[in-house]
Design a protein with these regions (language model features):
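Bacterial N-terminal signal peptides
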Residues: 8-16
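N-terminal small/polar-rich segments of proteins
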Residues: 23-93, 155-157, 161-286, 326-462, ...
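Post-signal peptide N-terminal segment of secreted/secretory-pathway proteins
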Residues: 69-171
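Long, charge-dense tracts
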Residues: 296-319
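Amphipathic, heptad-repeat alpha-helical segments used for oligomerization and assembly
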Residues: 487-525
Length: 547
């Protein structure tokens, strides 16, 4: 009797344990994935990052940290359709209306993931973010993301900014390993209260260790360099100020202008890759249709050239390894078609960009980046421009406040071009401002916005009489007349025989550092630390009675 009773008790325990096992999440631990290589792009021109496979796609770590001009918005060609994400290499589909957790063991950074990545134009995905927000995130991952119905979703975790920053600082040749946990369940649980998918009565939990090696680092360098180009009605370009990156050039039968437009550094561990392509693309569709493919060409050395024609012509990663620059050639017909299309007074960063395509990763292999250097393209007939005398788009200064401290001085070159000299030329300074006792001051602020400090500002120029003329210019957007400046005149003649003049002068914008008013904030409080401000200087020219 005692033996039978013991046997019945044992059977009862076995049945109980079997019942509990059948009601638990099923856990699958896969073999470690083979190490894969990636290429990291640090874009200093647009302040974002891009990561893309250097070899095979899976396990995935691919995509940009920010949307670019290639973002799909519901119409047109589909290029960039999500931000960057990771997975365990199995690209496992998710069930609609289930909940999903993803967390990392040995995570490279704290808070590495922001939520469930999806394709932005699929039903149930946010077109603006390509992200399904979880109920909660923590130092290891995210929990309780509701899988929306509609388009397919996969076990993909969107990478956070801190994840990209970790990849940025990794040395070329370095590797990182992490164990990815991905779990989905039909049970509706409250992740914000601490519940997790792996603890539910049913579901599927997958575990896999992945390793990624940084095979290359491509850094796109923003030089802030500016060059002026004036074009006549025939499209013939004339170089203005800051022309060190450009030269007149003839390629075959086409004459025009070639300019160094991208500066980069590329470090690698010997990676060989031909699936990564770069090429330029014209942003204006009408202009792109009007010009021929050889009217805009690009080169890695300024000697051998490829035409710009969609994705047909490109340079590969392997070809980029032998260079550090990208050059663009613009034919006279390119500029002529700009005039015909009514495109003038434009910065090349608004005219074209460079595209990056990795054919290995079709959904997240598209990326776009701006040029390192900029051309300001102006019509030679009736135009005005202003450019820093350092030929940079973003001149900066810093200094200390107090008696005897030197002013922050910014020098500019103003150019007008037309059939005659301009009848009126005006200049103004825009920026944060504060009026005190009837006078406008430029307003500098601390990073947290608590300290706001007034600074006087001045514009000064040399007049035709040789005297120095000074204007109070406290960032108040008030136009000041500079028509009587001392202009250096250069005559020009078009191929058609039309004549005109190009006039240049210099102007200085100064912010004194020794004015007593800047020792206190606008609330009349003392301050200590750093304050900053940014603004713009605008010019305007008027021609009258022109035939």
């Amino acid at each position: 009797m005692k033996v039978k009773g013991f046997a019945l008790l044992a059977l009862g325990l076995v049945a109980l344990y079997a019942s509990r096992a059948g009601a638990a999440v099923s856990k699958t631990t896969w073999a470690d994935a083979a190490a894969v290589q990636y290429v990291f792009v640090e874009n200093n021109s647009d302040d974002n990052f891009f990561v893309t496979p250097g070899g095979v796609l899976d396990p995935r770590m691919t995509g940009a940290s920010r949307w670019t001009g290639l973002k799909y918005t519901g119409s047109g060609t589909i290029y960039q359709q999500s931000l960057g994400y990771i997975d365990n290499g199995y690209n496992t589909g998710l069930n609609a209306n289930w909940q999903f957790d993803m967390w990392l063991e040995n995570a490279p950074v704290s808070y590495p993931l922001s939520g469930l990545r999806c394709i932005n134009w699929y039903a149930g995905c946010d077109m603006g973010t390509s992200l399904i927000l979880p109920q909660v995130t923590d130092a290891n991952g995210f929990y309780g993301a509701k899988v929306t119905s509609g388009g397919q979703k996969w076990m993909h975790g969107m990478m956070s900014d801190s994840f990209y920053q970790y990849l940025q600082q990794m040395p070329v040749g370095g590797s990182m390993s992490m164990t990815i946990n991905a779990c989905q369940t039909s049970v509706a649980y409250d992740a914000s209260s601490g519940a997790r998918c792996k603890d539910q009565a049913s579901g599927a939990w997958y575990v896999r260790k992945v390793t990624h090696t940084k095979a290359a680092s491509l850094k796109l360098i923003n030089t802030h360099s500016l060059t002026e180009v004036f074009i006549n009605s025939d499209g013939i370009p004339t170089l203005g100020e800051g022309n060190s990156n450009c030269q007149e050039q003839t390629i075959g039968t086409r004459s025009g202008l070639s300019c160094k437009m991208v500066n980069y550094t590329l470090q690698h561990n010997g990676l060989s890759n031909t699936s990564i392509h770069i090429f330029p693309a014209i942003s204006n569709s009408s202009l792109a249709s009007a010009v021929g493919s050889y009217d805009m060409q690009f080169s890695l050395n300024g000697n051998s050239w490829k035409p710009v024609s969609g994705t047909a012509y490109y340079y590969t990663f392997n070809e980029m390894k032998a260079s550090d620059s990208v050059y663009i050639f613009f034919s006279s017909n390119f500029f002529k078609q700009m005039v015909a299309q009514g495109i003038s007074d434009i910065n090349t960063q608004d005219l074209f960009n460079f595209r990056f395509q990795n054919t290995t990763s079709p959904e997240s292999g598209w990326y776009e980046f701006s040029t390192s250097n900029s051309l300001i393209i102006k019509p030679r007939d009736f135009s005005i421009s202003i450019i820093s005398d350092e030929y940079t788009s973003s001149p900066t200064r810093e200094g200390n406040v107090g008696a005897g401290e030197p002013a922050l001085d910014f020098g500019y070159i103003v150019t007008t071009s037309g059939k005659t000299a301009a009848d009126e030329v005006l200049i103004k300074v825009d920026g944060p401002a504060q009026s005190i006792a009837g006078r406008s001051y430029c307003l500098f602020s601390s990073a947290d916005g608590t300290a706001k400090v007034p600074f006087p500002a001045q514009l000064s120029l040399t007049t035709q009489s040789g005297a120095v003329k000074t204007y109070d210019a406290g960032c108040d957007s008030r136009w000041n007349d500079m028509t009587d400046a001392l202009w250096l005149t250069t005559p020009w003649t078009d191929a058609s025989g039309d004549v005109g003049v190009m006039n240049k002068t210099t102007v200085k914008f100064s912010i004194p550092m020794n004015d007593a008013i800047s020792l206190r904030t606008i609330n009349d409080e003392g301050w200590f630390g750093e304050v900053s401000a940014s603004g713009e200087i605008h010019v305007q020219a008027t021609w009258r009675n022109i035939n």
